[in-house]
Amino acid sequence: MKVINISFLCGLLFQSMLFGQKLTDVDGKSYSIATIKGYQWMTTNLAVKRFKNGEKIMQAQSQEEWKYAAANRIAAWCYYADETGVDMTTILYNWYAVSDKRGLAPSGTHIPSFGEWSALAKNLGGIEVAGGILKSKTGWETSQHLIADPANTFNAKPVGSRYIYLDASANWLDGKSKGKYTNFWTRSSINNDTNSEHAHRMGLAYDVDYLIDDLDGSAESILNAKGNGFSVRCVVDVLP
């Protein structure tokens, strides 16, 4: 009797999805993917509003709700907002959504660790230049710190962030970071301590080339508080 290798067949099925250069989340939203130094990365930010099991993620619609989610370690997302209004194309997550066991990343992908982000930066030529390479060609306040990437595959846009402690976020409509900054969560807590209130993030800024990466593995800062609202990119799982 012929034995069918289920793992092999599943691998082929997954690879066929991969070759189509698209991934789909539980809400039906599709994401393009691109190979960057041997790894498959999403080329746009995650924008899902439900976990993989179908349960809704809490949407915070005020600073009070955002702070409540952080204080109680509740997974939450919000739209970016500033004095010009609400940007409903930009979804920001707190770290508790990133780490929730119900699963934020689309099937077949995962949220990268601090180590995976560091490896990406190294493969792009180092922390000093990786930030400029990862930026989108448009949207930033200045093009002085963009480094030529003909493929422009990562395409990180300056969509802004939401900080739980900074004065700039004390007013829900006072973001002041769109066009200047963007941050991406890693799945790694500071010191690998899940009880810590801080986690590693990777940041890009309009006025520097380097990738802001919290190189000090024990750094705890208001800038990497788990209650902050940052963007998320996912990496395609490597098949065995």
Sequence positions of predicted segments:
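Bacterial Sec-dependent N-terminal signal peptides
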Residues: 1-21
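Conserved positions within compact, well-structured domain cores
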Residues: 21-240
